[in-house]
Amino acid sequence: MNDRFVCSLIEKSDLSNFVKKHSKNVFYDIAKAEAAVHQQTIDTIHFHEVGAIDSIVDIVGFFILWEQLEIEQVYSTPITDGSGTITIAHGVMPIPVPAVMELRKETNLIIQQDFEIKTELVTPTGLAIFKELSPLFVAPEQRLIEKIGYGFGKRETGKFNALRGSIFTETHSKKKRTEHHDQVLKIETNIDNQTPEQLGYVMDLLLEHGALDVFFTPIHMKKNRSAILLTVLTTTEEKEYFTELLFKHTSTIGMRFQTMERSVMDRSFKILETPFGKVHIKKNHYHGLLKESIEYQDCERIAKQYNFTIEEVYRLVQTLNNKTID
């Protein structure tokens, strides 16, 4: 059972064009990765993991559900794989397995390893599906969580072995607001006894937990001590949540709060297909005005993979984007 056979089954089915397209893309990506690992052509690759009926159901079923849920954009924190080795049909393999590493090429997927877990957490099938979703590794600006679900693994890893997903609607503060105006909470604190590396960790942590923005400002305190003014922007509803995070992960013993009015442009994303992979384009609207910006992470990936400069990638993407607009 090779990629062409599986894709033929999908194409002849009564599935929607949406489900057919994404399901076939996943099977093709897996076949391409396996072919590269085994130094064969795609047509000669006979699936092991994905050849089973249950795996076909997993992949096709996922995209049926995705279509029914009408999900517009996927956001993700970095995904975690284990470490060590695993025994599969081809023998003992390192973790991440070769097919997973091959699938990571041409992507901006962020995968971290937990060296305390000595088993595989990221499979080729799982990563191929995840790759097809074109996830953004940034926190959505504001959101109202509607549902939360968990998928539990059977392996005993010694840790919480589950994948958590949530469905949310991008929204603004629950306070009444006009079309483009709302309120945000600014949290500030002065820090003069933590290293840049420690503060960098704090910034990443706050953004991962949903802060609207985090930034540092160099300041001089009394006795001319150099320090950093740490500023966090969030919603008024999350005041206590971020207060606790800051007390826990920084050396501060106090902070200041200020509620502020702001004007924002409506935001959406589109995916631009390029010869070098997918690139996210951020679209911002305000009373007939339109501003578009190119996702930096996607350009960085292309620049590194194809030995371009960032400027060259930006120009290329901008040219292709202008053609789609025209």
From Swiss-Prot:
Gene3D superfamilies: Transcriptional regulatory protein pf0864 domain like
Disulfide bond positions: none
Keywords, comma-separated and alphabetical: Nickel
Pfam family, one: Ni_insertion
Family: Belongs to the LarC family.
Protein name, entry field: Putative nickel insertion protein
